[in-house]
Amino acid sequence: MSSLPVMVLFGLSFPPVFFVLMVSLTLFFVVNRLLQPTGIYDFVWHPALFNSALFCCLFYLLFRYGL
């Protein structure tokens, strides 16, 4: 038996990790919008790889310590 219950919204069941993914995606877009004007992407070798790593780090932090 899982310690995290399945959440049901409008008759659709979602695993708890789905909501953590949605929150981390929202937080990623906010952080990405804050980083773009700073010019940090000029120093990044591969922006898509940087964005993927940033999302993975945010997801890990939220899943491990947050939600």
Swiss-Prot record:
Membrane topology: Multi-pass membrane protein
Transmembrane segments: 10-30, 43-63
Protein's UniProt name: Protein AaeX
Entry-linked HAMAP family: AaeX
InterPro entries from the UniProt entry: DUF1656 (IPR012451)
Localisation per UniProt entry: Cell membrane
Main location: membrane
Pfam families per the UniProt record, alphabetical: DUF1656
Keyword annotations of the record: Cell membrane, Membrane, Transmembrane, Transmembrane helix
